[in-house]
Amino acid sequence: VSSRIKIMANIDISEKRRPQDGRILIKTLNKNIDLRVSTLPTIYGEKVVLRLLDQSNAMVGLEKLGLETDDRVIVDGIIAAPYGIVLVTGPTGSGKSTTLYSVLERLSKPEVNIITVEDPVEYTMTGINQIQVNEKAGLTFGEALRSILRQDPDKVMVGEIRDLETAQLAVRAALTGHLVLSTLHTNDAPSASIRLVEMGIAPFLVSSSLLAVIAQRLVRKLCVECRQEYTIPDKTADDLGIPRGSTAYKPMGCEVCRGTGYKGRSGIYEIMKVDEEIQNLILDGAAGHRIQQEAIREGMRTLRDSGLRKVLDGVTSLEEVLQVTLN
């Protein structure tokens, strides 16, 4: 089975000693399915993981990502800026790419020159110049981004800031009048600036180029056909900082949701705008918790708070939120 999958994914079937990645494109009557294949050698043989990307579900629009109304207004204001870096952070599989593609769709206009550098290109978009990284041919994130800056782009999307070179070029692009969108692996929004400094970017460059950070997670949505309302225990409510007597819903399972109690997913978000106060904290080398305190004081909702709002609204369960967020 693994050999057949590797053939379909254009992966070297004779190589079983190192990890490999590939791609399978399946066209059906109604949609195009993109399968990402990852192999990993173990002591018992190769482990194969398939990740399904449905091209038809890529452009869901900002209003369908799970952003609260006030958060959508904030995001619209952020991406309307002419220059600066906007980072989307979170672990693998947290919906970062979907958020970036939704933002690109919002920004896409015939007169706007948008160029992306991706590895891999997950979804093809009309009217946007997308570049596939090919390290074997020498086309790295850094090399592609360096060339992009000579193409007079208005907006630039870099799939991921992986190294110092890419980070330096992203900062340079932002400081020379481009809006740069990218992703980073951090646990929360305030940690993004610290991560850039740790990578080797000078604090004054981070503070002057970073526009905003959006941290996110995905939670499963409760099936509205079978969810069951209950009152949150007082101790739990006290621990979470929500009013006593608050109600939430728990999953039950039915035919509609195939017995899981859940149907669909929604994002929860932590949006930090980098204003003058936070810029000064970055310049001073402040710790992440200090930056977080200032951001909260200025109105930022943490991932936990955003998740609890969805719990109280009946969108997801308390267990889902506690599983993906920290207090």
Q: What would you call each of these model-derived segments?
A:
Residues 1-327:
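Short, flexible helix-loop junctions that flank or precede catalytic/ligand sites
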